[in-house]
């Protein structure tokens, strides 16, 4: 069970916004680049001003990013805007945005740099394994338990928590360790989905 499974409900809430954007000639690629720019700006701000209180921004930005990610996909599929450039921007944008938004955790007090870097590596690995499934079977794997939406929820809540209760940062490394384990589990599940689908065929 992952948050990805409630994506259809989220999309239905965003559909009026999608039609408004389409009517005003906003393309899927515009939305993708906006999400990337927002993530890079926020990440840079959190790195340059490494104050826990600023991590209040993280849940807000992550929610906006999730909405933008949903909108770019909807515009691409439902408004006939799918392009090869869009696919490249989407996949690379997701990985770069994840790094930009989660790298600032490295600069928080009590954070072990090696654990944060390991977590970021595992994040990239899960996305790679999802794409690997698409390359082999033609269907991208979104298997959990720690997909993009789940990460946004957990890390957004943690950003809120350390902003309000800075003393909670003593648990940073425990969270990075658990997150890395869940990410590796996710990567394994995505690879297994490739094997199962191949066996069924």
Predicted features, each with a name:
Residues 1-63, 100-201:
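Hydrophobic alpha-helical transmembrane segments
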Residues 55-87:
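Glycine-rich active-site/cofactor-binding loop and its immediate structural neighborhood
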Residues 74-114:
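Basic, amphipathic juxtamembrane/active-site segments
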